[in-house]
Amino acid sequence: MDQQEILNTIVLTRLNYFSLAGMLDLYRKVGSATTILENKDNIQDILPDASPKLLAALANTDEARKRAEVELEYDLRYGIEAICMNDDRYPQRLKECDDAPLMLFYKGNANLNQQRVINIVGTRHCTPYGEDLIRRFVSDLRQLCPQVLIVSGLA
């Protein structure tokens, strides 16, 4: 995925626009954050029913771009992968959700399109019993199904 598309997708996620579903709809119709931002001044040609809020958000992207540049620099420095929705690595099942995020961030080398995926969401204040339980659960799960992808919810 090219860095410009990643940067532009981060920009879209940082706009002061309160309808993520609307932004997702626009992204799916256009297929690229770069195309959206290149056509931001005439977005109604692409999306005739664009809301006034969307038009206002796209009219001023400077602050969102500054924040996105800082975020992308941080991601690159610390080896954090940014995956846009139009990237082949983006989880296909997640794309089917009406409220799928425009992008995901992760570290590692996991195939996010594994056949079997389990999400484990923990707590910020785990007890020793909970730590032991999840450690044994994950160990047993890996033996039963070695190809399972275990995703942390980062509670």
Region spans (language model):
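Short, positively charged patches
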Residues: M1-S139, Q143
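Structural motif
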Residues: M85, V151-L154
